[in-house]
């Protein structure tokens, strides 16, 4: 499990290095620096060169620099649920639950294209001014939230696209396309993140202690999973955040299921 998680994280780190440095390494020394290789090949090579401590460091939302490997620091945590968060003068759009009520998928994609443009502009400004990448000042956004809003006690329900799996999937895909840019592009504009995988629907106060063990296989696959499947397979989302609670007695972040 650790190897799998690290390889997935390394793939995104390689992409992050590409979108932030774009040729800053003057000479290729190792296979992971060879952009002609597949992401998987590069990730496997880089993982093999990391120490245990370096692998552990990559599991945080703030990845430390690794000068010996030519890797700069990278922050994974920013938010753009309805526009870039915590960044001053940016456009604030309606909450996702409101956008979902429009049933207008192309509009949602345009909204998040604007959000990604503004995120890029903010990041370019800080980069040009020598401001290091930090939390909320980065190119990785933990958006969209494609959980199913079933419990009115959940104080984050407004982050979702409602209780319909099909609509949630369509809206989520539009968000990812708007944030990441065209799949045919050489590099992504941002790294989008599908969250929270899976069966995460509140209430918020019990998210770290809840053990969900009453979900039928049919409900799992017809209600909770479709949006995540579509975001990964169709929209090519670059990140997936696991849920906080347990499912069938196993923490979602460590479940073999």
Q: What residues fall within each predicted segment?
A:
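N-terminal compositionally biased, intrinsically disordered segments and leader/signal-like regions
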Residues: 5, 21-22, 36
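Bacterial N-terminal signal peptides
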Residues: 14-22
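Glycoside hydrolase catalytic-domain context in secreted enzymes
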Residues: 27-257
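Bacterial N-terminal signal peptides that target proteins for export
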Residues: 3-14
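Extreme N-terminus of proteins, especially the signal/transit-peptide cleavage junction
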Residues: 8, 24-28
């Amino acid at each position: 499990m650790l190897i799998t998680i690290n390889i997935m994280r390394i793939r995104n780190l390689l992409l992050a290095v590409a979108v932030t440095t774009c040729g800053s390494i003057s000479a290729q020394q190792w296979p992971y620096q060879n952009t002609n290789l597949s992401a998987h090949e590069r990730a496997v090579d880089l993982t093999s060169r990391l120490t245990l401590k370096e692998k552990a460091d990559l599991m945080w939302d703030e990845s430390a620099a690794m000068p010996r490997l030519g890797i700069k620091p990278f922050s994974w945590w920013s938010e753009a649920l309805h526009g870039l968060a915590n960044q001053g003068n940016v456009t604030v759009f309606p909450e996702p639950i409101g956008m979902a009520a429009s049933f207008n998928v192309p509009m949602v994609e345009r909204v998040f294209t604007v959000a990604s443009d503004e995120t890029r502009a903010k990041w370019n400004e800080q980069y040009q001014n020598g401001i290091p990448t930090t939390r909320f000042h980065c190119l990785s956004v933990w958006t969209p939230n494609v959980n199913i809003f079933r419990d009115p006690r959940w104080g984050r329900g407004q982050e979702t696209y409602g209780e319909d799996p099909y609509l949630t999937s369509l809206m989520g895909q539009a968000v990812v396309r708007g944030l990441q840019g065209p799949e045919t592009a050489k590099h992504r504009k941002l790294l989008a993140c599908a969250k929270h995988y899976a069966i995460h629907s509140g209430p918020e106060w019990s998210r770290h202690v809840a053990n969900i063990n009453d979900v039928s296989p049919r409900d799992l696959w017809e209600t909770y999973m479709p949006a995540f499947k579509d975001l990964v397979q169709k929209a090519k989302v670059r990140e997936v955040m696991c849920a906080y609670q347990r499912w069938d007695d196993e923490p979602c972040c460590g479940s073999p299921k």
